[in-house]
């Protein structure tokens, strides 16, 4: 188990209310964006441009790609735009879970942005997928989100 992966106690998990809502960051490669479009849920994209800001006022799960060099190089794994978004206390307060993408070529740092955010925010890491994700990943994430919002 990676040192950044923690077990979130079920009695501390704040369950989301309302409808499924996702917030995500996708670079200009649009890998995460394409995955989000397949989910068919209301969503909000964190801007690539650091000068732009977005704000939320309802519960969401954040989708984050991983940026790092693999191995022990985890510095910069969470995109700066995501950090900026979460540095806003109100934005941070509505986060209920994390889903991360990454590249399995990076071994034990695969999708490490997920465990990092889960630990920092004390919210569950719900799923990790590789790059663009597969159709099976899309189905799995839809099932996870539907269940997470209902229970």
UniProtKB/Swiss-Prot annotation:
GO terms for biological process: protein modification process. This is Protein NrdI. NCBIfam families: nrdI (TIGR00333). Probably involved in ribonucleotide reductase function. Gene3D superfamilies: 3.40.50.360. GO terms for molecular function: FMN binding. Belongs to the NrdI family.
């Amino acid at each position: 188990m990676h040192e950044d992966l923690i077990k979130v106690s079920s009695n501390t998990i704040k369950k989301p209310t309302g409808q499924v809502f996702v917030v995500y960051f996708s670079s200009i490669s649009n890998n995460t964006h394409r995955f989000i479009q397949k989910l068919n849920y209301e969503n909000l994209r964190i801007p690539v441009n650091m000068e732009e800001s977005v704000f939320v006022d309802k519960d969401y799960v954040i989708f984050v790609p991983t940026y790092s060099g693999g191995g022990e190089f985890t510095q910069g794994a969470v995109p700066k735009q995501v950090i900026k978004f979460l540095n806003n206390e109100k934005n941070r307060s509505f986060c209920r879970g994390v889903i991360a993408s990454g590249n399995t070529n990076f071994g034990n740092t695969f999708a490490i942005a997920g465990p990092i955010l889960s630990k920092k925010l004390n919210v569950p890491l719900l799923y990790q997928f590789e790059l663009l994700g597969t159709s099976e990943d899309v189905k799995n994430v839809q099932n996870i989100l539907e269940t997470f919002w209902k229970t």
